[in-house]
Design a protein with these regions (language model features):
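Conserved phosphate/pyrophosphate-binding and hydrolysis machinery centered on Walker-type P-loop NTPases
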Residues: 181-185
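Conserved non-catalytic scaffold segment of RNase H-like nuclease domains
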Residues: 6-142, 157-179
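GIY-YIG nuclease catalytic motif and its immediate N-terminal context
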Residues: 186-239
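Residues on a specific face of well-ordered alpha-helices
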Residues: 149, 162-166, 186-190
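Conserved beta-strand -> loop -> alpha-helix junction used to position metal-binding or nucleic-acid-contacting
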Residues: 138-152
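Active-site catalytic microenvironments for nucleophilic, acid-base chemistry
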Residues: 131-134, 153, 170, 191-198
Length: 239
C-alpha cells in the first residue's frame, strides 16, 4: 500500500497526517481489468538457443473468457525427442505450421493492452522478447503478473510445490495442464482466479495492489499474510 500525507495548519504550526487510502482510491478495480493468460511450448529451456513450437493465450475479464489464441509454430529446427514425449507435438505437426514471423504480430494484437499473466512468466516472455528483437518488434511492455510469485506469497504452506499441475489441482481447475499451450494457459487462468479470491480476502481489490503483492514486504497486506501463515491449515480445535 501507499501512504498519502496531508499537511494541516492547526494554529500551532503545520501538522502532517499520514493516512492509508482505501484500495478503491488507488487504481483500477480488478473487476475492470482484462487479463491475457499466456503459455508457450518450446524446443528447450533457453531463448538464446531454442525456438517456440506452440502459442496459447486467452483473454479474460471478471473470470469470463473473451477470446482465445492458439497456433502451432514451425520452429525451423528438428524437435528434440524429449520435447515430443513431453508435449505430444511431433515434427509432422509443425512442418506446415506458420513461422514465428507470422505468429508474433497476430499475438501482439491479441494481447493488446491486457495485463499479461503466466506461470513462470519470465520463461515465456524471454522467448517472445527474443523473437521480437530478432524481427524488429518492441518487447512486450504490458504490466505482468506471474502466478508462481503470487502463489508463493498466498498459498505456499498449503501445497507441496508450485508447479502448475499442483496448483491447478489445488484450485480444482476443470482444465488439466498437459504441456499444450492453450490448455496450460486456461489452467493458469483457473489458478489465477483462486489466487485472486485469496488476495481479495486480504483486502486487495485494485490492480496496482495485486501487482505489488508478491514483493510488498512490510505492507499491511504482508502483515495480514504473515498472520494468516500462523493459522492452522486444517479444521479442528487447536490449543
Amino acid at each position: 500500500g501507499r501512504c498519502i500525507e496531508h499537511m494541516f495548519d492547526v494554529g500551532s504550526g503545520p501538522v502532517t497526517i499520514a493516512y492509508q487510502p482505501s484500495f478503491d482510491d488507488l487504481g483500477m478495480p480488478l473487476s475492470e481489468v482484462t487479463f491475457c493468460v499466456l503459455d508457450l511450448e518450446t524446443t528447450g529451456g533457453s531463448a538464446a538457443t531454442c525456438e517456440i513450437t506452440e502459442v496459447g493465450a486467452a483473454r479474460y475479464r471478471m473470470g469470463e473468457e473473451l477470446g482465445a489464441f492458439q497456433t502451432l509454430v514451425n520452429p525451423g529446427v528438428a524437435l528434440p525427442p524429449f520435447i515430443t514425449v513431453l508435449t505430444g507435438i511431433t515434427q509432422a505437426m509443425v512442418v506446415e505450421a506458420p513461422r514465428i514471423e507470422a505468429v508474433l504480430p497476430a499475438l501482439i494484437e491479441f494481447i493488446g493492452d491486457a495485463v499479461v499473466v503466466g506461470h513462470n512468466l519470465r520463461f515465456d516472455l524471454s522467448f517472445l522478447d527474443a523473437a521480437a528483437r530478432r524481427l524488429g518488434y518492441p518487447k512486450v511492455s504490458n504490466r505482468t503478473l506471474d502466478t508462481v510469485a503470487l502463489a508463493r506469497r498466498l498459498v505456499r504452506p498449503e501445497v507441496r510445490n508450485l508447479k502448475l499441475s499442483t496448483l491447478a489441482g489445488h484450485f480444482r481447475s476443470p482444465v488439466t495442464p498437459n504441456h499444450r499451450a492453450l490448455d496450460d494457459a486456461r489452467a493458469t487462468a483457473y489458478v489465477l482466479w483462486g489466487l485472486l479470491e485469496r488476495a481479495g480476502g486480504l483486502g486487495v481489490t485494485a490492480l496496482e495492489d495485486l501487482l505489488q503483492l508478491p514483493t510488498a514486504r512490510g505492507s499491511a497486506h504482508y502483515r495480514k499474510i504473515a498472520l494468516a501463515d500462523d493459522l492452522p491449515r486444517r479444521p479442528g480445535v487447536y490449543m
